[in-house]
Amino acid sequence: MVLALQANFCLVALEVAGPDGRARLLCTRRTLLAKSGQRICVGDRVRVEAIDWSAGRGVVAALEPRTNLLPRPAVANVSRILVVAALREPDLDPLQLTRFLVTAEASGTAVQVVLSKVDLAPLPDVEAWCERLRGWGYAVHAVSARAGVGIEALRHSLAEPGIVVVCGPSGVGKSSLLNALRPDLELRTAAVSGRLRRGRHTTRHVELFSLGPALVADSPGFNRPELPEDPASLERFFPELRRQLSQQPCRFRNCRHLGDPGCGMAGAWDRQKLYGHCLAELLERGAHGSGQQEEALRQRGDRREPRLNPQLRRGSRRLDRQRLDAALEEDDSGEDR
């Protein structure tokens, strides 16, 4: 399995250790993989050949089929996603958190929420947010890496085999959380920017770390994950909306679930405005994309050479020569007669 990628190399963990007990190899990949467009990602199961045990090197010759692929961060065969959101420093942004949750839901993987830095917020605020997130349909872990709150409970929840991706905005404490779960990692951390109150990027690449039977991926922070492209699919990525519509479907197939008559989501719901914001962005993006396509077609049409009437086109020189030769042969045969 691929544990990490850097430059043109990948670190691969072996299912069976080598003759010298080596369990990891630093590998390149076959040129054929690159030419065929097969991209190696962290979490991929691969076949390694041309092993040099003394140097600890090998070559990735083939990729095994994936169960799934998380696009950002690019991790394959994911079992669970932990979306980390800080209550303070930086303050929790419901829309930003929703974007991360929608992106995670779109992968088809089990999703949970980790509320970090709970020691910096009043207890009523922590409890209110935990209750709110459960209403959204998520299991919640309230933790503080600095105070050690909730760390053991989170470690216990990671006791099953599989790949767990830890993702979230910059500065929410993902690396600090992993350091608390496994102190020997000593991952680099940094304080939130004092002037902008934004997180600083400390993790530069994705890497898998063992945590009991699980493999946990620390990922670089980013603040604006992309939403799925299809507006019609958005409802599937809001668990509370999905749950309600399964019990009380809408009267209309094309309902936007914004409180219109006949909608299964009668009345306001907690994330209605957040859902509406995401939906509006997707609809605007689609309209903008259609407009760009129409404009491109129009401009291309303006440059296109007009099609002439077939009767006015100049004939093919080859066909003209064939007809001329045929006519000459016919004349010759007529003279012979």
Where are these regions (language model features)?
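Canonical P-loop GTPase G-domain recognition
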Residues: L120-V172
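Switch/coupling subdomain of P-loop NTPase systems
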Residues: V46, V78, L95-T109
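General small-molecule cofactor/ligand-binding pocket signal
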Residues: A61, H141, A217
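Helix-rich effector regions associated with P-loop NTPase G domains
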Residues: N8, S36-R45, A50-I51, E64-A74, ...
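Catalytic P-loop NTPase motifs of RecA-like helicase/translocase cores
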Residues: D91, A121, V149, N223-P225
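Walker A/P-loop
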Residues: S175-S176, A180
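Conserved beta-strand/loop subsegment of P-loop NTPase cores
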Residues: V78-A85, A106-V118, G137-A142
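N-terminal accessory targeting/assembly segments
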Residues: M1-P94
